[in-house]
Amino acid sequence: MAEKSFKYVIVGGGVSAGYAAREFAKQGVKPGELAIISKEAVAPYERPALSKAYLFPEGAARLPGFHVCVGSGGERQLPEWYAEKGISLILSTEIVKADLASKTLVSAAGESFKYQTLVIATGTTVLKLSDFGVQGADSKNIFYLREIDDADQLVEALKAKKNGKAVVVGGGYIGLELSAVLRLNNIEVNMVYPEPWCMPRLFTEGIAAFYEGYYKNKGVNIIKGTVAVGFDTHPNGEVKEVKLKDGRVLEADIVVVGVGARPLTTLFKGQVEEEKGGIKTDAFFKTSVPDVYAVGDVATFPLKMYNEIRRVEHVDHSRKSAEQAVKAIFASEQGKSVDEYDYLPYFYSRAFDLSWQFYGDNVGETVLFGDADPNSATHKFGQYWIKDGKIVGAFLESGSPEENKAIAKVAKVQPPATLDQLAQEGISFASKI
């Protein structure tokens, strides 16, 4: 097969790829210089929609409605956008070999692609129950959610199993968002996770108690402290029951699993430095190999604010790291410099009529403020994290846009404060910074 050659290649077609393409266009990339190679069949889209509006029973989001960059208020980049800019969108193409020394990528179909500068935007893949050797984990109607194909399969199952029963395995982002959207589809939901409370990597027990209570009121049955150890099926291979480690057996027409993800670094193993499961980069997302950059979920980068190296799995960082890398690529070509990446960690979620945001670092002592009663009609609450006498993190449920900006600012500025002061003042403390 003929070899294709580009000045710049982005491998991966998710959020980072789409935002990188926009920055390449802003920086004046010439027609024919840039290619995006993606194993997905569609142009880059805003992935968070898949666990939210894509699954709504009415008024569901569909492509081309949520191509990047609409998630951050930007222009919607349809396939035509890439064509107009002279960017090659090479879809349904999986790269199976990467030789960084010879600057060559090879696809599953045997096509060869040469590049001068490579941006690795491969993201993560979901951990599957079969990875842990769970019996029956390959039964039909056990779903994972990462790509649009996964969401389409789940949509079909929701139609086929109207008013059925679901078991959601996992108490993180996917577990919480999908339990909510399954209830909106009038599906009976059991949610199972091993930890003592939901979202344990971010939530404290106090925050989690609100969401668990709220979900319970919405009809989600939460089972904590155990895991799925096996599945029984109907003769047609569809899942029938979920066996739990504590001996309980749950009926299920649909199972949705969200037990974490792992970075897709396999192509580059032994060729680039890795750290904390990801590809190690500097503050410009340059890897240990010249002319090779890594962005988004796959990059382990210096988090300047906290003087440490981290890997962050979140759409906000996927967008911003992609833009930073492309700015750095053009600056280095022009003999100029750009500022180091100075990221404020940010996480958010929306489910039912809830909406929370978190900024900063969840370390140190905590203080909960506001009304965190799940039975309250006017629930609105938050939490601060204090370390060495300074605020380092802030969480807010049901905040206004101004209040959300205020908690972001307080996490960035890190003003001194006492627990008593914050308990008394609550959100008003952040609002006056």
Swiss-Prot record:
One of its GO terms (cellular component) is cytoplasm. It is found in: Cytoplasm. NAD(+) binds at residues 171-177, 195, 201, 260, 313-314, 348. The keyword NADP applies. Its main location: cytoplasm. Its cofactor is FAD. Induction: By wounding. It is an enzyme of class 1 (oxidoreductase). Expressed in leaves, and to a lesser degree in stems, roots and all stages of fruit. Its EC number is 1.6.5.4. GO terms for molecular function: monodehydroascorbate reductase (NADH) activity; oxidoreductase activity, acting on NAD(P)H. NADP(+) binds at residues 173-177, 201, 260, 313-314, 348. The keyword Cytoplasm applies. L-ascorbate binds at residues 319, 350. FAD binds at residues 13-16, 40, 47, 52, 95, 146-147, 297, 315, 348. Coiled coil: none annotated. Gene3D superfamilies: 3.30.390.30, FAD/NAD(P)-binding domain (3.50.50.60). It catalyses: 2 monodehydro-L-ascorbate radical + NADH + H(+) = 2 L-ascorbate + NAD(+). Belongs to the FAD-dependent oxidoreductase family. Catalyzes the conversion of monodehydroascorbate to ascorbate, oxidizing NADH in the process. This is Monodehydroascorbate reductase. The lineage of its organism: Eukaryota, Viridiplantae, Streptophyta, Embryophyta, Tracheophyta. The gene is AFRR.
